[in-house]
Structures are given as C-alpha cells and as structure tokens.
Amino acid sequence: MEEEEGADDGEQGEEEVLVVNVGSTYPCKRSDGSQHDAEIVKVRYNKQAGREEYYAHYVGLNRRQNEWVDKSRLVLTKPPKEGETNGTDQEVTDTAEQPDSKTPQKRKIEEPEPEPKKAKVEEKDASKNASSLGAAGDFAEELTCPLCVELFKDPVMVACGHNFCRSCIDKAWEGQSSFACPECRESITDRKYTINRVLANLAKKAACTPVTPVEKKTRPLEKCSEHDERLKLYCKDDGTLSCVICRDSLKHASHNFLPILDAVGVYREELSAIVAPLEASLKVTEQLSSEQSDKIEQHNKNMSQYKEHITSEFEKLHKFLREREEKLLEQLKEQGENLLTEMENNLVKMQESQDAIKKTISLAKERMEDTDSISFLMDIKAFIDKCQEQQRAVISTGNTLLSKELCQGTFKGPIQYIMWKELKSVVIPSLTPMLLDPTSAHPNLHLSDGLTSVRYGENKLSLPDNPKRFSQCILVLGSQGFDSGRHYWEVEVGDKTAWDVGMASESSNRKGKIKLNPKNGYWAIWLRNGNAYKALESPSKSLSLSSHPRKIGVYVDYEGGQISFYNADDMTIIYTFNATFTEKLYPYLSPFLHDSGKNVDPLRFVHNK
C-alpha cells in the first residue's frame, strides 16, 4: 500500500485500498483457470514476492484443494463512497445499511507501515467465528494420527490408550525387540493393539464432511519452509526432509526419496548396526582396562620385590659394590618407570576410548528412542557419520593390553655371581659343581669318567633299563637335585650347532617320545641348525640373541618360582620361566645328534678352578 501523487495539482491524495478480511468469502480464480467461491482462512506475508498472500478454502470442495493465493486472484468489489450515486438522479437513501460480514470493506491509507510483514489484516466477526473454529480444530486434531499427522486410517489403540494408524504403528515398531508407545514412551510388553472402530467411524465422517479449515497446531519444522507443504519425504542424497513439491523440483532431480516412516526405520536400523559393535568394543575395552589395572598392580609389586632382592644382595658386597648397586637400581627405576608410563598411558587411552564409546552409545540410543520422526531425521546422516567415525577410531586405535614385564633375569638373578664376573678380586660367588647321573642317560650318550661331560655316540651302549633312564629322547639328568634355595650352574656349549639345556622335575616322564615343555615338567632352551634358539614353552618361543653364547648359565630360585638362562660369557639374560615348583628339580642336558660331523663336541659342566 503506497501513497501516490495527484495527477493534476501535485498534492498528495489518498487512495482507497480494498481490504481482504479473514473469514470472508470472495470469488477466486483457481490454478486451473476456473472460478470458485473461496473463504479466506489466514494471511501471510511473502518476503520474496513482497506481497500478502491468503490461504483460500474453496467452499464445498475437498480441503486438500486449499491453496495460497495473492490478491490478484481474488475478485474484489469496491463499495460506493458516502454521497455518491450510481450515475442517475436518484437520491441517496436516508438509511445507512450495515455492511455484511462477508462484504469487503475499505480502509484509508494512513502512515506508511515500517515493516510489510507487520501489516495487520482486519478480521471481521472474529469473536463470532472463534468458538466454532477452535472447536473444529480441536475435533480435527483428535482425529489426527500423531505419526503421519493425517486423519486416522484403520486406527488402533495400544495398551497405554494412545491411538495410531495401524500401518503407522507397524512401521514404528518394525525391527524392534522391545516396544514402547511412540507418543508417551510407555513400555508395552507385547506387540498388541486393539482396533478402535468408534474412532475409525469418526475419522470417516470427518473426511466426508466439509469442515471449516483451521490453522493446525503443528510441531516445529513440520512444514516445508519453502513451499509451506507438509514434510512427508526424506531425501537420501541431500539428507533433508522434503515435501512433495521439493521432490518434483530441479533441485532434487534424480534424487532418491523415502517416506518419513520408512526413513526412520532404515536409519534406526543403521544406527542399531553401529551400536552393536560399539557395545562389543566397549565390553572388550572394559575388560582390557581391568586387566591393565591388574597388570599395573602386579608390576608395582614386582618392582617392590625386585628392589628388595637387589638391596639384600648388594648389602653383602658392602661398600665395594655400592657404585654398582646404585647403577643397577637406576637401571631398574628407568626400565620400571618406562614400562609403567607405557601401561598407564595405555590405560588412559583405553579409558578415553571407553568414555567416547559410552558417550556415542548413549547419544545413539537417545536418538533411537526419539519418537518424533522429524527431530529424529534432522541431520541423521551427519550423526551417523559421527558414530561411524567413533567406530573407526576404536578399530584404528586398536585397544590392546600391554603386558610388558621387567627384566626378571637382570634384576632378580644371581646378582653376586654377576658382580663376581666384574669384580673377581672382590668377591668369589659359589658356583654349584654339577655332575651327570649315569642311571638316567640315554644308551647313545657317552659320559666322561668324571661325569662332567657328555657326547652323542652312534653306537648304543649296553645299559640296564630302569625307570630313570630315557628310552627315546637323547637326554641325561644331573645327579644333584634342588627342592629349595637358589642355585646357579653353567654348561659349556662351545661351537656346537645343536643342544638342549634345562631343568626337569623328578617325576617327569623318561620313556618314549616326550614333548619338552613346562606342562610335562621340563623348562629348557635349545639350539638347532647353528642359529635357531627357542624357549620350550607351550607353544615354543623363538629367541633372538645378540651373540652366540659359548657357555650357558642356569639360575634356579626354587621358592621364587624362577628359572633363568644367561649367556654366561657376559651374563646377559636369554630367557626366564616362572612356575610354582612342588617337587625336586634336576639339571638336564642333550648334546643332540652329530649333524654330519658338525655337532660332535660334548657338553661340559663348568667347575671352579
């Protein structure tokens, strides 16, 4: 509405503007070119077009044909001004007629309005129509399914008393293991509902009865902001909610669409598929975190025990070995703290991963429990991408349990003997002088007269059989066993290409083929093919040695449950077994076969000279 200049006198005049009243009926040009009486239900201001638009209900027609129109499509009549005639000499009647409620009225242009969108439309007979419009709106709302927001079709009532279209509630519950009312979220034991025939009849009558359209109470974002049509579709390509007009627009050309309820089912299932492995990952992470905490606790206990052992050994060396003691303690501290830091950092990482997984699961479950299809599908793809990113992060970080141990052989070994190697002039440790037991030797083994060395012979010796003798494995035991205390002995292996060195329990099997491992009472290491070292665990473990040892040292701590093997040339640790010993332990040796003459040298116990 504007002020225009007068054509003749240049002064500003007033222009009468025809007013469209809400609740009034006008002839209206329909989109198909026909003309039909239309009742104006509501008004809006179209910012893009810069004009007011009116929601027209075509009297007597289905409400689905209602549409927004501008003033140009309404046939408006201009009422005569006071005192004017119709072109004859008739006098103006003395009686002023009261304008009909459905007769368009005029209004004068007053001051320019600051904002077009704030322009007010006069509503006549508002008080007269308010009651009927409100009642009609409430009635229509009671007959509307809360899921599809349409009149009920084949309505059913669930246990809590809420009603839904049968197809809507079936889609909402599809693929779920537990059920809840989409409206109030009350848990429902069985997937059962009751047909509501009364509501079905009312909905049918409402669909067939022309009802004065009223503005529905809609939830936020229930209508398309661009076309003001109900959002019924979900665009899979753009990840947006769309109306039917959006679907047919160029913007969405060749895009794939799903009905909203179908989209909810698809993406709820996709979220469920993400949550399941995340929950499994959470359980694994929680278990690993618990085990890591136990490892840290045991690690701290071991550090304390090793420190006590080291201190007690070094006290025997007095001030001559103080410098070496401090050096070794520093080594223990550095290695222990490094290992502890690694494990603690790993625990922190696991806990952070655990918290992130819990948060993602919580958000995903909260999203899945959202019964509002509109809010559920808002940015659902971005939310799923975020969940998948968390899933990939769990897989890529690969939560693993760190189970690194302190070097038991270095910190809890024969400390005094190691020190003796460095300080021969200060201390002389006790090296146990071992001898071989001829009653246990395999018939192909030849023992020296002093019972200190053994070699393999091609010819079998004629020896009496007894329970102690090995019948198939080429082994021999030492004559001295240990059932308490700490002991250390050495065997010279020289340049042999194959050998076995270890400890055997007193009751271990000696007959037939024997699998050498701790389960069968054997704790040993061996060499094969000149460079293949193994610890005979179950299963066996390959060992990587920095140098080829010519002498092997064996340390036994019976009460401590420890058997450690060393390169006796420089006292570097090779391997440590841990076990609980319940019977006497004996050294055992095997010089193995000749290997075409490459392995003919004997094995020899080392004695102090």
Swiss-Prot record:
Positions of Zn(2+) binding: C224, H227, C246, H252
Gene Ontology cellular-component terms listed: cytoplasm; nucleus
A GO molecular-function descriptor: zinc ion binding
Residue ranges covered by zinc fingers (B box-type): 219-260
Disulphide connectivity of cysteines: none
Annotated compartments: Nucleus
Pfam families according to UniProt: PRY, SPRY, Tudor-knot, zf-B_box, zf-C3HC4_4
Principal location listed in the UniProt entry: nucleus
Modified residues (Phosphothreonine): T103
Polar residues: bias regions: 85-102
Subunit structure: Monomer.
Official protein name in the record: Nuclear factor 7, brain
